[in-house]
């Protein structure tokens, strides 16, 4: 008889566990009676222990605690409160991360007899649709929003890079290559370093190209090669004091040349050239600050040569008149 008693004791242990689980509705083990993740299907075999009182009953959720995972539903027909556990929810909202039922939501469920009273099972929305879920439950779409938010800034980076690459490289083929090379570091380093680079990248790109274009019109290739060097230095060093020092040095030889021109030229040439000289002074003073004086000296000599020719021309005319 002792051996038979030993064999009968193990089945008694799970029964005690089930009864203990039902006495603690706040614990997750309370869902063992109504079914765990696989308990939804185990509700039918558990029908031997729990009787099905009613099926497809409509009710309004009285309250539901998402953290603890249980609440109560008020039946519409008998106005009776029915206990509901999160494991009893059969069709959850696919957008919700946890199983839950919203407060005041109308649901359809089966009423099962539990040890402490009526319990809900197979909870769905009216007509078998998924339940809406509690507003306090975590939303799965919250994790999908990040790539969508990152989309517009990336497009903005590409457009900004297209404008920069178009200014640097005149060819249309070189632009996409520059984009492919520039996209990778921005993805790794993300946004803060990108915004920090903006002021440093804009100044040389938008300020230097017009200066180079003006120099190429009047200067030789050697002068253009020398002009590229101070442009790089200006990016790293403070170049405003250099610009202020430059103009007074450039004015001295021009004034001397102007005095020589005034002595050699006649009244007609003097009346024509002063506006030209003023225009040249203003032009060089404003836009050609970062340039070296070497190419400008070449321009000054070129500018000084034609007046010398003009001065010789009136002398020849005067000699012919005599």
From Swiss-Prot:
Which residues get modified to Phosphotyrosine? Answer: 160
Residue spans of biased composition, Basic and acidic residues class: 290-303
* Residues annotated as domain CSD: 59-123
Q: Does the keyword Ligase apply?
A: no
Q: Which residues cross the membrane?
A: none
Q: Which organism is it from?
A: Rattus norvegicus
Bias type Gly residues, positions: 28-39
Keyword list, A-Z:
Acetylation, Activator, Cytoplasm, DNA-binding, Isopeptide bond, Mitogen, mRNA processing, mRNA splicing, Nucleus, Phosphoprotein, Repressor, RNA-binding, Secreted, Transcription, Transcription regulation, Ubl conjugation
One matching Pfam family is CSD
Record-listed N6-acetyllysine modification sites: 299, 302
Cross-linked residues, Glycyl lysine isopeptide (Lys-Gly) (interchain with G-Cter in SUMO2): 24
An example of a Gene Ontology BP annotation on this entry? protein localization to cytoplasmic stress granule
**Compositionally biased, Low complexity: which spans?**
14-27, 153-164, 192-206
Print the domain comment field.
In the CSD domain, Trp-63 specifically recognizes C5-methylcytosine (m5C) modification through its indole ring.
Report the residues modified as N-acetylserine.
2
Compartments reported by the entry: Cytoplasm; Nucleus; Cytoplasmic granule; Secreted
Return the annotated site residues (Important for C5-methylcytosine-recognition). 63
Please give the GO cellular component terms listed in this UniProt entry: CRD-mediated mRNA stability complex; cytoplasm; cytoplasmic stress granule; dendrite; extracellular exosome; histone pre-mRNA 3'end processing complex; neuronal cell body; nucleus
Please identify the protein, giving its name as recorded: Y-box-binding protein 1
Record's comment on post-translational modification: Ubiquitinated by RBBP6; leading to a decrease of YBX1 transactivational ability. Phosphorylated; increased by TGFB1 treatment. Phosphorylation by PKB/AKT1 reduces interaction with cytoplasmic mRNA. In the absence of phosphorylation the protein is retained in the cytoplasm.
On subunit structure and binding partners, the annotation says: Homodimer in the presence of ATP. Component of the coding region determinant (CRD)-mediated complex, composed of DHX9, HNRNPU, IGF2BP1, SYNCRIP and YBX1. Identified in a IGF2BP1-dependent mRNP granule complex containing untranslated mRNAs. Component of the U11/U12 snRNPs that are part of the U12-type spliceosome. Identified in a histone pre-mRNA complex, at least composed of ERI1, LSM11, SLBP, SNRPB, SYNCRIP and YBX1. Interacts with IGF2BP1 and RBBP6. Component of cytoplasmic messenger ribonucleoprotein particles (mRNPs).
* Site residues, Cleavage: 217-218
Q: Where is this region: Disordered?
A: 1-47, 118-322
């Amino acid at each position: 008889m002792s051996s038979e008693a030993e064999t009968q004791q193990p089945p008694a242990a799970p029964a005690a566990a089930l009864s203990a689980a039902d006495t603690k509705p706040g614990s997750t083990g309370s869902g063992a009676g109504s079914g765990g993740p696989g308990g939804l299907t185990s509700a039918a075999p558990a029908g031997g222990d729990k009787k099905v009182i009613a099926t497809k009953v409509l009710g309004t959720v009285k309250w539901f605690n998402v953290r603890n995972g249980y609440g109560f539903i008020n039946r519409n027909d008998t106005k009776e409160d029915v206990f509901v556990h999160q494991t009893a929810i059969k069709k959850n909202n696919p957008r919700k991360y946890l199983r839950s039922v919203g407060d005041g939501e109308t649901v359809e469920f089966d009423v099962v007899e539990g040890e402490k009273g009526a319990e809900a099972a197979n909870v769905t929305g009216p007509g078998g649709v998924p339940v809406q879920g509690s507003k306090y439950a975590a939303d799965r779409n919250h994790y999908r929003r990040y790539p969508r938010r990152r989309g517009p800034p990336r497009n903005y980076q590409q457009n900004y890079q297209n404008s920069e690459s178009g200014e640097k490289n005149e060819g249309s083929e070189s632009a996409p290559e520059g984009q492919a090379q520039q996209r990778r570091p921005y993805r790794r380093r993300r946004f803060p370093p990108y915004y920090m680079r903006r002021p440093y990248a804009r100044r040389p790109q938008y300020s230097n190209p017009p200066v180079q274009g003006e120099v190429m019109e009047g200067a030789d290739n050697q002068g253009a090669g020398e002009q590229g060097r101070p442009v790089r230095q200006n990016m790293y060093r403070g170049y405003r004091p250099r610009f202020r020092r430059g103009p007074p040095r450039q004015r001295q030889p021009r004034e001397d040349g102007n005095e020589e021109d005034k002595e050699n030229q006649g009244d007609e040439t003097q009346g024509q050239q002063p506006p030209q000289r003023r225009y040249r002074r203003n032009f060089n003073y404003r836009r050609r600050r970062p340039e070296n004086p070497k190419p400008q000296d070449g321009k000054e000599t070129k500018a000084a040569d034609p007046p010398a020719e003009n001065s010789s021309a009136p002398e020849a005319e005067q000699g012919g008149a005599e």
